[in-house]
């Protein structure tokens, strides 16, 4: 009887230990490895040849861009800053002196800027990256003590949407002389991605042996690099000295009219 009591006590403790181990393991969240193999470079070199310098100044407003929620704030800031730098480089390559305006609003031009600026360039737009609904699938982890991974996955293709509109202004009057718009959904940019997140439940025993991979951030950076290059390529084609000098007559009339 005494031996039997010891056996029952041992079995009970073993059961408790096993239950505790299971509870501990079930409570562990699986590890997610986020890849970082792509750099956000946002590079572009003007394709057109440098032309003869003119004694004319162009006011360059800061871009007023909005971004989709999946684009990190630091990426937004770099995209905006690089846009300003590269458009400035394109305009300088076309022979213009560039005055950077620390605002995206034409109403913030100083009188001196209005007076000395031949033209002004303003940019607005929406930079959107979204999963292609036709080529994206979602798989949610089912709750369970044993085989639940505790990981939800979205796998598919990231595509661009939104637009960028560039407006050419006469600074003194603030009147628009011309504009052109780029539809980002027309760009042939497709980035495969796998986004992995923790499920609302902690997962089962198998979750302790599972490692999830998430390369969605790399896909976003790669897509932004390509979007940026496409936007700058279009800017390079449109913001030529030949095109910008074609506004000279209208710009002069508007400036003189405002000065009367």
Curated annotation (Swiss-Prot):
Residues 134-139 are annotated as: N-acetyl-neuraminyl-alpha(2,3)-lactose binding motif. GO terms for cellular component: cell outer membrane. It holds the Pfam family NLBH. It is found in: Cell outer membrane. Residues 1-27 form the signal peptide. It is a lipid-anchor. The N-terminus is blocked. Keywords: Cell outer membrane, Lipoprotein, Membrane, Palmitate, Signal. Its main location: membrane. Coiled coil: none annotated. InterPro entries: NeuraminylLac-bd_hemagglutn, NeuraminylLac-bd_hemagglutn_sf. It comes from the Bacteria. A lipid is attached at residue 28 (N-palmitoyl cysteine). A lipid is attached at residue 28 (S-diacylglycerol cysteine). The keyword Phosphoprotein does not apply. The keyword Lipoprotein applies. This is Neuraminyllactose-binding hemagglutinin.
């Amino acid at each position: 009887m005494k031996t039997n009591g010891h056996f029952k006590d041992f079995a009970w403790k073993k059961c408790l230990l096993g239950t505790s181990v299971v509870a501990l393991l079930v409570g562990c969240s699986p590890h997610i490895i986020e890849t970082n193999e792509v750099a956000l470079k946002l590079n572009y070199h003007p394709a057109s040849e440098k032309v003869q310098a003119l004694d004319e100044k162009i006011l360059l407003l800061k871009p007023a861009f909005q971004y989709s929620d999946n684009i990190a704030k630091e990426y937004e800031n770099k995209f905006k800053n690089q846009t300003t730098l590269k458009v400035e480089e394109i305009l300088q390559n076309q022979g213009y002196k560039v005055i950077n305006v620390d605002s995206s609003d034409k109403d913030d031009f100083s009188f001196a800027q209005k007076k000395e600026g031949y033209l002004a360039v303003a940019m607005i737009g929406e930079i959107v990256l979204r999963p292609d609904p036709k080529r994206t699938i979602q798989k949610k982890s089912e709750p369970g003590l044993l085989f639940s991974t505790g990981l939800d996955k979205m796998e598919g293709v990231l595509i661009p949407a939104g637009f960028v509109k560039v407006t050419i202004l006469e600074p003194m009057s603030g009147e628009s002389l011309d504009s052109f718009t780029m539809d980002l959904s027309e760009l042939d940019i497709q980035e495969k991605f796998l986004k992995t997140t923790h499920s609302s439940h902690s997962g089962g025993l198998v979750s302790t042996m599972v490692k999830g991979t998430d390369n969605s951030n790399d896909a976003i950076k790669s897509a932004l690099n390509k979007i940026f290059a496409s936007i700058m390529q279009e800017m390079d084609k449109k913001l030529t000295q030949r095109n910008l000098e074609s506004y000279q007559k209208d710009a002069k009339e508007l400036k003189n009219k405002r000065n009367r």
